[in-house]
Swiss-Prot record:
Catalyzes the phosphorylation of the 3'-hydroxyl group of dephosphocoenzyme A to form coenzyme A. This is Dephospho-CoA kinase. Keywords: ATP-binding, Coenzyme A biosynthesis, Cytoplasm, Kinase, Nucleotide-binding, Transferase. InterPro entries: Depp_CoAkinase, P-loop_NTPase. Its EC number is 2.7.1.24. HAMAP family: Dephospho_CoA_kinase. It comes from Chlorobium chlorochromatii (strain CaD3). GO terms for molecular function: ATP binding; dephospho-CoA kinase activity.
Length: 212
């Protein structure tokens, strides 16, 4: 019997929007989850070509070894460079995103063989990197700027000023919303977000079942 691809769903949103929480909820409801940003971070310390490329871009001092002897990357230093240097940001993305795309294709193949109904792809820069191509549904999670800053600071992602600088170089919420199939407002409680995600899951499951 021929394996059928699952419904491919992209979830994105700016820093502090709550996209990761939506993805965790979807995973708890039975969706398979591909975390593009996690895969990208793994490539940065495991893929020899990526390591060579990052070293060429930012210098060998961005890498070090932890007490366990494992290679680690100083992402904070890199973030400070790329958020003020679009050329290096573009070079970094061109280095990593094609390899993430290969990993996602492998995840799609595995999901099809396992008869998975819905595969969710979480990515911070889904549209910006072109990673939305081929997806069936794209969900954008949004929240008020002040709330996003507060969440990011609470997570220890930087000071208020650092977070605001990062938000300033991300795509505007209006631009993301215009490209989305579904927009989820996350200005409320985690419980409210769960209910919205549950409704989304039920809609996605209906779409997935129609394909099988």
């Amino acid at each position: 019997m021929e394996s059928k691809l699952p419904l491919l769903v992209g979830v994105t949103g700016g820093l502090g929007s709550g996209k990761s929480m939506v993805c965790r909820y979807l995973a708890s409801m039975g969706c398979a989850l591909f975390e593009a940003d996690v895969v990208a971070k793994e490539l940065q310390v495991r893929d020899s070509k990526v390591i060579e490329g990052i070293t060429a871009l930012f210098g060998k001092e961005v890498y070090s070894y932890n007490p366990k002897g494992e290679l680690q990357l100083n992402r904070k230093d890199i973030a400070q460079v790329v958020f003020s240097n679009q050329e290096k940001l573009g070079a970094l993305n061109r280095l990593i995103h094609p390899r993430v795309a290969v990993a996602f294709q492998q995840a799609c193949d595995n999901a099809a063989r396992s008869n998975v109904a819905i595969l969710v792809k979480e990515a911070a820069i889904l549209f910006e990197s072109g990673a939305h191509a081929g997806l069936d549904v794209v969900v954008v999670v949004q929240a008020a700027t002040e709330l996003r800053v507060e969440r990011a600071v609470q997570k220890g992602l930087g000071t208020r000023e650092e977070i605001l600088r990062r938000l300033a170089v991300q795509w505007a919420p209006e631009k993301l919303a215009a490209l989305a199939d579904v927009v989820i407002d996350n200005n409320g409680t985690p419980e409210a977000l769960y209910e919205k995600t549950k409704q989304l899951y039920e809609q996605l499951l209906q779409q997935a079942m129609l394909r099988r």
